[in-house]
């Protein structure tokens, strides 16, 4: 089992024990052929971690309250998008006539987590030997690195909730241990500062 799937399973197990209602928002995954058929019109390839994530969970509709909103951040860019929604909004990222057109070092971005205005994206056509970074796109079209890659994002989440570095029940970080969270974040994203957009 990969570190990505293992960390996702850790999150699910923790939620089933501590917040069973939240765990119910985790949808079943798609098969590889279902994923491929939903994104077949994409003009670029996506990294292996993308397929692994969607085989674990198919995501949720935009209006569904999910675990991701409470685990990762106080912002709205943390709900795992269904592929239907991601495919609906991604053309805005690549259409140069759109105000929200954006890319990462000349490569396309695909919105895997998000809301109607802010997104966490994976990089398309990523050919580096390392996994794709996760890039945050704000509603004012600024980009910055959120996580070194998708695995580091989930490792950060799993360890943070298990160590009680974040209070899962809050909508903001009023009840979080900033020092402990930062320690966990930089443990799994130690070279984040080396990356630049």
Predicted segments with their positions:
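Short, surface-exposed beta-strand/loop micro-motifs that present aromatic residues
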Residues: 120-126
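Intrinsically disordered, low-complexity regulatory segments enriched in Ser/Thr/Pro
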Residues: 130-138
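Short strand-connecting beta-turns/loops that link adjacent beta-strands
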Residues: 117, 128-129
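Acidic, proline/glycine-rich low-complexity IDRs
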Residues: 165-197
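Short acidic/polar capping segments at secondary-structure boundaries
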Residues: 116-118, 140-143
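Short, flexible helical or helix-coil boundary motifs
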Residues: 15-18, 22, 157, 161, ...
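Compact, glycine/acidic-enriched structural inserts
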Residues: 136, 143-163
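A surface-exposed partner-binding patch
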Residues: 1-117, 186-197
């Amino acid at each position: 089992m990969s570190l990505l799937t293992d960390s996702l399973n850790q999150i699910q197990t923790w939620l089933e024990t501590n917040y069973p209602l939240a765990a119910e928002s985790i949808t079943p995954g798609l098969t590889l052929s279902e994923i491929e058929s939903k994104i077949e019109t994409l003009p670029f390839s996506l990294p292996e971690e993308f397929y692994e994530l969607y085989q674990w969970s198919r995501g949720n509709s935009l209006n569904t309250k999910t675990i991701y909103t409470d685990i990762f951040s106080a912002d709205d860019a943390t709900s795992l998008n269904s592929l239907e929604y991601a495919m609906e909004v991604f053309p805005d990222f690549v259409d140069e006539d759109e105000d929200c057109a954006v890319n990462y070092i000349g490569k396309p971005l695909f919105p895997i987590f998000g809301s109607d205005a802010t997104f966490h994206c994976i990089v398309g056509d990523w050919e580096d030997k390392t996994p794709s970074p996760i890039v945050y796109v704000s509603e004012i079209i600024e980009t910055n690195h959120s996580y070194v890659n998708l695995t580091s994002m989930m490792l950060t989440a799993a360890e943070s909730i298990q160590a009680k570095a974040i209070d899962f029940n809050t909508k903001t970080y009023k009840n979080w241990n900033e020092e402990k969270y930062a320690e966990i974040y930089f443990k799994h994203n130690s070279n984040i500062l080396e990356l630049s957009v």
